[in-house]
Amino acid sequence: MAELQEVQITEEKPLLPGQTPEAAKTHSVETPYGSVTFTVYGTPKPKRPAILTYHDVGLNYKSCFQPLFQFEDMQEIIQNFVRVHVDAPGMEEGAPVFPLGYQYPSLDQLADMIPCVLQYLNFSTIIGVGVGAGAYILARYALNHPDTVEGLVLINIDPNAKRWMDWAAHKLTGLTSSIPEMILGHLFSQEELSGNSELIQKYRNIITHAPNLDNIELYWNSYNNRRDLNFERGGDITLKCPVMLVVGDQAPHEDAVVECNSKLDPTQTSFLKMADSGGQPQLTQPGKLTEAFKYFLQGMGYMASSCMTRLSRSRTASLTSAASVDGNRSRSRTLSQSSESGTLSSGPPGHTMEVSC
């Protein structure tokens, strides 16, 4: 029987009432593919990368990441890093609708805008955090500029181009569903949509009544026309930095993330499969994701052990080693809930980890 190790799960605590939000500075910069808007929080820290985020289709940086970065325990992280939130063109608040016939950038071109952002800010390296389309964009950027990326947190990434069967299903769905409903099906699981929780109602309202819905459709079309990233384990096309892959259990992109995990270097990759988190774990489980992010950063040498003391709270989990059922995947470890207490030592990624929490 595999030896059990235990790790405590942080209790979920939103930003405390009355806690002053960070000051933000919003900038726009011209690139070869049009203007891009980004918002900077904090000040650069010596010898530390910036945390750069990129949001999914139907969202902007606030609706995608605010619940995560305003979470109380996340403050330990953001005090130590400057943060750059990139909005895809036309997705920023108050963005004008693009004129009819506007050629929206491809996802590859959106990735090629990032060097302009970093040059404008005079930042040399980043830790990228992306969701869905944003995860793809950051992965593409990391392939093109590996020396500038120290780590990646990729939530719901699908590294594959749409295949003809996917296209047929997409076209058929488009005949019977509106753009907002198709995007909601991309963001959330069918179980979540059927449950119609307050979260689903909120995001359905945000997308359905978005004044820039035409722009959102352009971003959606670019995502559906993405190229294959062609990851190959042991090949030349791979991510060179530490990577944490994240997906919710039974989320729309679960299979794609599992496949992506099988193609990346197991010595550099951690795989976090989050139970009870639905399609958007950064919205539904910010506490668990914050904790995982802290361990990821600690493994990279950026979060000292003294910064991790607040992790020892309330709920606990057990870490057990298990062999993968997929021959293409490496030996994995699974994190499951337990009633006993303990700690998990952190270090650089040593092999692929499959984590359910």
Curated annotation (Swiss-Prot):
UniProt xrefs under Gene3D superfamilies: alpha/beta hydrolase
Biological process, per Gene Ontology: cell differentiation; nervous system development; signal transduction; Wnt signaling pathway
Entry keywords, A to Z: Acetylation, Cell projection, Cytoplasm, Developmental protein, Differentiation, Neurogenesis, Phosphoprotein, Tumor suppressor, Wnt signaling pathway
Compartments in which it is found: Cytoplasm; Cytoplasm, Perinuclear region; Cell projection, Growth cone
Phosphothreonine modifications at: T20, T316, T320, T334, T343
Top-level taxon of the source organism: Eukaryota
Phosphoserine PTM sites in chain numbering: S312, S314, S318, S321, S324, S330, S336, S338, S339, S341, S356
Low complexity bias: start-end ranges: 333-347
GO CC terms of this entry: cytoplasm; growth cone; perinuclear region of cytoplasm
Chain positions covered by the region annotation Disordered: 1-28, 320-357
Modified residues (N-acetylalanine): A2
InterPro entries in the record: AB_hydrolase_fold, NDRG
Family: Belongs to the NDRG family.
Role this protein plays: Contributes to the regulation of the Wnt signaling pathway. Down-regulates CTNNB1-mediated transcriptional activation of target genes, such as CCND1, and may thereby act as tumor suppressor. May be involved in dendritic cell and neuron differentiation.
Quaternary structure annotation from Swiss-Prot or TrEMBL: Interacts with CTNNB1.
Protein name: Protein NDRG2
Upper classification of the organism: Eukaryota, Metazoa, Chordata, Craniata, Vertebrata
Gene name for this UniProt entry: NDRG2
